[in-house]
Amino acid sequence: MSKIIIISNRLPVTVKRKGKSLEYIESIGGLTTGLKSYHEKADSIWAGWPGISDEDISSRQKKNIEKKLKEDYDCIPVFLSDEEIDQYYYGFCNKTIWPLFHYFSSETEYDPEKWEAYKEVNQKFFEKIKPSISRNDTIWVHDYQLMLLPSLIKQAYPSTKVGFFLHIPFPSFEIFRLLVWREEILEGLLGADLIGFHTYDYVRHFLSSTRRLLGLEDKLNVISYEDKYVRVDSFPMGIDYERFTGEYDEKSLAPEVLQINEIKETKTILSIDRLDYSKGIPERIKAFARFLQEYPQYKEKVRLNLIVAPSRVE
């Protein structure tokens, strides 16, 4: 029977040490929020890093984690060492891909050792999921940490359907061409049968890069690549609306709801983001201050609430 295999850098559940024991807590982030409800309802398994270094746990604890995640969460953990976490995740992913794809080229680092770590970890993810792959499965790879994985899967399992979704912008060709390993990244992504982005602008940027860097032709968002066709399209990501509307009636929210309702004739602007330079948080504050300066009649009638989550810290 065919199944869906979701693969992302992080699992929807994070494993942490608590004294001599381990605790399992829900992961936070846009990817987890967007996919968790789907995973719970679908016949799927989810592979990813559980958030704890394999150097912090014993072999016995590893087996216990694997058993717990499989039985309770339908998840497969991919364990990473401290060096892999530092070089692959905090290194290449967050110091090369993240700033460049967000147009912060001056913040981008190009380190061959971190690139090698990125390749090795993508290979490690592939080796971990290989025993779970069947011919008719659908494999859904997510985000910039695993852009080489679609090609690794497709080369080993040509008949398996592979999808990829990028949760961050795909930059214009003028920016993407600055990446030293640009061709390898494109070839890794083109292992997928379907590549998804948030907006059509990102689709257009990707197609432009495949044309100008790899010499590939496309028609109606379909690329002819090697012996197959790759469809590229935009799929704006949503949320589980029913889940969040149901939360509104929870008693834990009542005090906050009542407090907001007591503020008569006041509009509230709500901003929720990670504390990251790409989110434009200082610019939002400056923009709101300028708004009040230019339209003083809105003072005490419009309020800006900022909720800022810690940025990628363990």
Kindly label every feature range from the protein language model:
Residues M1-E314:
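Catalytic cores of carbohydrate-active enzymes across secretory and cytosolic contexts
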